[in-house]
């Protein structure tokens, strides 16, 4: 069962619009060797991928202005970073700025005294961010995290050329999705690319399906630690729908060997081997980086997740994460902490970062951007994703970030086994209910 501190913010981190307009970015690439942070000097770790250049530019700008107090930077692939930061936090060797997803993990950092209270110290940067996204960085009303990049809804991408070639309607309902799966599968095309090796992309299916079928309150019961919360019929129905997709060949036969870190899931779409991809908005940057002509030629379409006939959830609801966050390590010397806070106020999400994010097709977690997209190469996508977030009646933080680390890992383990056909929904429910008593 989760500690009360992990449920204190924004109704258990199930985020409601208009109280939230916001969105787990994940990077691709290779892992450098990396070392622990020093308490006496500024250091930062972040993710490889499309946004790495923006972070490097920001910290280099700080370094040029502060040559006696420079940041050392290291970048890691998403899955490698999560393992490395867990070890560094536990050993007291975290970098000065701790890259995180808020939610249950940040609450654990707070409970263990691993990060510092930033309340009243980062008002300058919070003043330019979307207020509700800034609130996600709070634990028990105190500010421990500051948004550092873009809002990230989970979006259904599709290869428009393949849809036109096979006369398939972009799916806005579950029945239309299953029809598309059947058509593409019969044509020898993988209907939906899925990075099953990374496992966390599979969460997007159970999150959206549970919300579409049962509404946002279903997961809130699990967040609140209610007995047998995972026995809700909507969760069982969501799992049955996942099995329906797998059995229909929606993900092909090799999804268990596809990695999101390497961008292989997006590559299957832009090379025409797969028709669709359910992934976060950050993957748009991957498409632009790896297949610029594919994007420029209008071959990438995007939709919200399809509605479920008779479902209790609002089809405009969104899942994902509000943004990523910087927290300041409690292990750093006090004067180093103050320098990190100065960076956050003066350089983080400033105009230069905003312009850089917009240029790559990412939406910074900054207020008042509605008129900023006109004339940009990525205007259609930026407007779609920004409106998707702002107009969502409810936005659910990704379950693996909303939950504490132990039940989150159990969730990932059991969900992977569902996709691989190793367990049935009743076994998943039993296993997850057991985490409520742990």
Language-model segments: which ranges?
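Glycine-centered hinge/linker elements that transmit conformational signals in sensory
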Residues: 224-256
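Short, solvent-exposed loop/beta-turn-alpha elements that line the ligand-binding surface or hinge
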Residues: 117-131, 196, 213-237, 291-295, ...
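Extracytoplasmic/periplasmic substrate-recognition and gating elements
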Residues: 64, 248-251, 291-360
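Hinge/lid segment of periplasmic solute-binding proteins
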Residues: 103-154, 178, 205
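Conserved N-terminal structural module of periplasmic/extracytoplasmic solute-binding proteins
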Residues: 2-107, 335, 427, 434-438
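C-terminal capping/gating helix-and-loop segments adjacent to ligand/active sites or protein-protein/ligand interfaces
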Residues: 138, 147, 223, 360-370, ...
């Amino acid at each position: 069962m989760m500690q009360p501190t992990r449920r204190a913010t924004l109704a258990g981190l199930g985020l409601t619009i208009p109280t939230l307009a916001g969105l787990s970015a994940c990077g691709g690439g290779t892992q450098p060797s990396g070392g622990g942070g020093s308490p006496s000097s500024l250091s930062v770790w972040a993710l490889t991928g499309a946004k790495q250049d923006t972070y490097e530019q920001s910290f280099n700008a700080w370094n040029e202005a502060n040559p006696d107090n420079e940041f050392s930077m290291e970048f890691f692939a998403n899955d490698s970073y999560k393992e490395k930061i867990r070890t560094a936090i536990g050993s007291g060797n975290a970098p000065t700025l701790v890259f995180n997803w808020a939610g249950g993990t940040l609450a654990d950092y707070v409970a263990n005294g691993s990060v510092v209270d930033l309340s009243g110290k980062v008002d300058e940067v919070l003043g330019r961010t979307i207020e509700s996204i800034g609130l996600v960085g709070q634990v028990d009303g105190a500010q421990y995290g500051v948004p550092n990049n873009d809002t990230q809804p989970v979006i259904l991408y599709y290869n428009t050329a393949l849809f036109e070639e096979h006369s398939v309607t972009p799916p806005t309902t579950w029945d239309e999705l299953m029809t598309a799966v059947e058509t593409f599968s019969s044509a020898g095309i993988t209907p939906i690319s899925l990075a099953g090796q990374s496992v966390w992309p599979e969460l997007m299916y159970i999150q959206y399906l549970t919300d579409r079928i049962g509404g946002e309150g279903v997961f809130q019961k699990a967040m609140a630690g209610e007995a047998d919360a995972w026995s809700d019929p909507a969760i069982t129905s969501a799992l049955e729908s996942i099995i329906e997709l797998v059995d229909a060949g929606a993900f092909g036969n090799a999804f268990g060997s596809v990695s999101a870190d390497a961008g292989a899931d997006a590559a299957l779409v832009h090379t025409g081997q797969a028709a669709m991809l359910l992934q976060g908005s950050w993957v748009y940057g991957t498409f632009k980086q790896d297949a610029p002509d594919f994007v420029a030629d209008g071959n990438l379409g995007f939709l919200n997740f399809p509605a479920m006939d008779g479902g209790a959830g609002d089809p405009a609801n969104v899942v994902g994460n509000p943004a990523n966050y910087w927290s300041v390590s409690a292990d750093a010397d006090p004067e180093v902490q103050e320098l990190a806070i100065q960076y956050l106020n003066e350089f983080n999400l400033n105009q230069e970062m905003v312009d850089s994010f917009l240029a790559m097709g990412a939406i910074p977690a900054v207020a008042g951007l509605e008129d900023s997209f006109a004339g940009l190469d990525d205007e259609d996508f930026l407007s779609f994703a920004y409106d998707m977030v702002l107009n969502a009646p409810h936005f659910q933080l990704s379950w693996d970030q909303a939950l504490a680390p132990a039940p989150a890992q159990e969730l990932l383990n059991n969900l992977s086994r569902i996709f691989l056909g190793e367990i049935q929904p009743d076994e998943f429910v039993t296993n997850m209910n057991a985490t409520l008593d742990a």
